[in-house]
């Protein structure tokens, strides 16, 4: 199928927008080009057998609005008419959704494409800066977020258009660099023999790292959830949790720095999601920035590159709303990812 974008095609309002993650799904309806999205309560994906059930019960049955179009962001690659979600049992079948829910037009994007779209739609009040110089107005950007997994997407500016670049950067290799790393990495759980960024830099990865540190030191792991570990680490209440959080932000700095180099992100590197928002105090210590900038021979470049934590609680929906209102602002590839009634 030929490359296609939405420069000359608009979506019919009202538009349902949805950010579908591995654990939670967030929905809103955009009534027109000027209205703020009408948001709905967060949906737990485990509470519904299918996405159609969730949309019908949690959204359509709760409003008099009848969406004509839908723009959905899903956790995982978008390929074909059946889209499996990473870390969820839901399968997105746009043609079935059109038949059962009455949509005439559906666009499905990667969830971190939506996060990338949000980067140019959010104001400074929703960004917490973590060092670096002033961002270049049209400089390339990259977004990464530890959550259920580790999402990554780029955003580049060309021909007066912002172009999101989705990918699976969270599955890049993550290796040891220090003597302490060498002690800990043998105890990390692996996937087919390898440690990727997502094996450490996400919720379950935080637990993986915590347990590996405990095993390396022959100590008992007292906590079993990411929330317990981050809370204890931030409060300096548990020695293993403190080291876990310190190493977590160090490894996140390394990966964020690598991605900043890949995209030459003079427009900024953006951290998103609930974990990043919760650990801002840890990100502001010197460990994250030191790891981020330790990219010889480009240390000076990295020292100038700004990093931000996105603090908006519904950033992806904000990005989807911006796209739904003015598709021409963004060079979103829709070939193979848009379904319309003829």
UniProtKB/Swiss-Prot annotation:
One of its GO terms (biological process) is glycolytic process. It catalyses: D-glucose + ATP = D-glucose 6-phosphate + ADP + H(+). ATP binds at residues 18-23. NCBIfam families: glk, PRK00292.1-4. Belongs to the bacterial glucokinase family. This is Glucokinase. One of its GO terms (cellular component) is cytosol. CDD domains: ASKHA_NBD_GLK. GO terms for molecular function: ATP binding; D-glucose binding; glucokinase activity. Its EC number is 2.7.1.2. Its main location: cytoplasm. SUPFAM superfamilies: Actin-like ATPase domain. It comes from the Bacteria. InterPro entries: ATPase_NBD (IPR043129), Bacterial_glucokinase (IPR050201), Glucokinase (IPR003836). Keywords: ATP-binding, Cytoplasm, Glycolysis, Kinase, Nucleotide-binding, Transferase. Gene3D superfamilies: 3.30.420.40, 3.40.367.20. Transmembrane segments: none annotated. It is found in: Cytoplasm. It holds the Pfam family Glucokinase.
């Amino acid at each position: 199928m030929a490359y296609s974008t939405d420069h000359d095609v608009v979506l019919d309002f009202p538009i349902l927008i949805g950010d579908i993650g591995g654990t939670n799904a967030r929905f809103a309806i955009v009534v027109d080009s000027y209205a703020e999205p009408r948001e709905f309560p967060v949906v737990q994906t485990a509470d519904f057998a299918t996405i159609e059930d969730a949309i019908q019960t949690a959204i359509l049955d709760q409003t008099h609005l009848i969406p004509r179009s839908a723009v959905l962001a899903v956790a995982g690659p978008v390929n074909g008419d059946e889209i499996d979600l990473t870390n969820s049992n839901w399968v997105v079948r746009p043609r079935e959704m059109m038949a059962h829910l009455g949509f005439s037009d559906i666009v499905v994007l990667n969830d971190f494409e939506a996060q990338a779209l949000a980067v140019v739609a959010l104001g400074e009040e929703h960004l917490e800066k973590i060092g670096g110089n002033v961002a270049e107005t049209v400089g390339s950007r990259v977004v990464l977020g530890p959550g259920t997994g580790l999402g990554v997407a780029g955003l580049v500016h060309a021909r007066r258009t912002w172009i999101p670049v989705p990918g699976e950067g969270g599955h890049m290799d993550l290796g040891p660099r220090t003597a302490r790393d060498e002690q800990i990495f043998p105890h990390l759980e692996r996937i087919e023999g390898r440690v990727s960024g997502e094996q450490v830099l996400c919720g379950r990865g935080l637990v993986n790292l915590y347990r590996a540190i405990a095993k390396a030191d022959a100590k008992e792991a007292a906590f079993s959830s990411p929330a317990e570990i981050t809370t204890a680490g931030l409060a300096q209440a548990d020695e293993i949790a403190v080291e876990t959080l310190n190493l977590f932000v160090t490894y996140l700095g390394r990966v964020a720095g690598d991605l900043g180099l890949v995209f030459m992100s003079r427009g900024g590197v953006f951290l998103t999601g609930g974990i990043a928002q919760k650990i801002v105090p840890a990100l502001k210590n010197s460990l994250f920035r030191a790891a981020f900038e330790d990219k010889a021979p480009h240390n000076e470049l990295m020292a100038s590159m700004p990093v931000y934590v996105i603090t908006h609680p519904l950033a992806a929906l904000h990005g989807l709303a911006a796209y739904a209102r003015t598709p021409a602002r963004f060079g979103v590839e829709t070939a193979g990812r848009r379904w319309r009634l003829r």
